[in-house]
Amino acid sequence: MTLPILLGWFLTLCSSHIVRSCLQCDQVIRYVHEDFLSTVKGIRVRDQIELKKIIDHAYTNYRETSKLLSGVIDPTTLYRARTEYQSEFKRHWKEDRTNSLQWDLITIVEKGKRILQKHLEIFIAEGLCPNKCGLLYQRVMNCTSCQYGLFTCLSAKPPLDCGEHHLEADEGEEVVLDCFLSWHTLVVGQTEYHYSWHPGETNVLFDGEYEELVVTKESKIVLNQLSVSEEGSYRCLLKDQKGTALSRTFFQLEVKPFPSTSPRQVVTLPSLPLGYENTPYSLQKSSFLTVLILLTVLSITGSLIIIEYLRKSLKRQEEARGRDSRTAGDIELNTE
């Protein structure tokens, strides 16, 4: 198969199969191709020029066909496609090469096209504009200019609205508010979550109706020791470093109060018989005075008895000592 026929077949193949990729924008892939051309030995200059034309035309074809889709790719997808293509390119020249250098080059370029197409189709289906709500400026590469820029992703839902959540909690408990969405990680630059509160039960769109609570880098906040006065509508806004609101989430919080304490049942006692005006546990006034007087008399009487007993005991002791003294005197006289 002559070189012109191979080249014509390659151009027809590239035109019939759309290559949805930005292969020509990856500098590493360009280096791979340049290194390949510089290491080819034993061919004529004309053949080397033809190989260079095959690669250059592939770049042109990639650029033109990428416009048929979105025309953009993100850094992660480009890295995955490049890594797989590099591996296949090296393996091809070690294991699958034939006697025709031109045919081998066409084969590996076509294989690279399928690899790149596979990765880009996944990106278009899952990675491009993943936000189902809100506003996202996604960083992607333009496959025509090979320059990075911000791709505007508008959701089909009303502007910025990203859902409403109904929460219930008992008074004194805590509740967690979290408005994080997976696509928030794709926002370029610094972001902040703005939480505010409105006491009403319905969502209010005007900023002036909301009381600012906290501005934080974290997507969630914790409300501790809830009281009934804290129920209402909570709003979470994600803002970028320019202050542009990108998503808006509402939380309707209902706080259930503590169960009311039942009043203690008062037991009504039956009426006392006639003549008893006081409670059963109190003595009548006259009886109380009588008992008090009686106790006083008994106390005084007991005290007098004790005093008299002590007085007589002391008197007997003194008389006993007197008798002992006289007896001792008589004994001394008799002795003399």
Swiss-Prot record:
Disulfide bonds join C179-C236. Belongs to the Izumo family. It comes from the Eukaryota. Forms a complex with tmem81 and spaca6 on spermatocyte cell membrane. The complex binds to oocyte protein bncr. CDD domains: Ig (cd00096). InterPro entries: Ig-like_dom (IPR007110), Ig-like_dom_sf (IPR036179), Ig-like_fold (IPR013783), Ig_sub (IPR003599), IZUMO (IPR029389), Izumo-Ig (IPR032699), IZUMO1 (IPR032700). It is a single-pass type I membrane protein. Keywords: Cell membrane, Cytoplasmic vesicle, Disulfide bond, Fertilization, Immunoglobulin domain, Membrane, Signal, Transmembrane, Transmembrane helix. It is found in: Cell membrane; Cytoplasmic vesicle, Secretory vesicle, Acrosome membrane. GO terms for molecular function: protein binding involved in heterotypic cell-cell adhesion; signaling receptor binding. GO terms for biological process: fusion of sperm to egg plasma membrane involved in single fertilization; heterotypic cell-cell adhesion; sperm-egg recognition. PROSITE patterns: IG_LIKE. Changing W103A: Loss of interaction with bncr. Residues 1-16 form the signal peptide. The gene is izumo1. GO terms for cellular component: acrosomal membrane; plasma membrane. Residues 158-247 form the Ig-like C2-type domain. Expressed in sperm. Essential sperm cell-surface protein required for fertilization by acting as a ligand for bncr receptor on egg. The interaction of the complex izumo1:spaca6:tmemt81 with bncr is a necessary adhesion event between sperm and egg that is required for fertilization. It holds the Pfam family Izumo-Ig. Coiled coil: none annotated. Izumo is the name of a Japanese shrine to marriage. The chain crosses the membrane at residues 287-307. This is Izumo sperm-egg fusion protein 1.
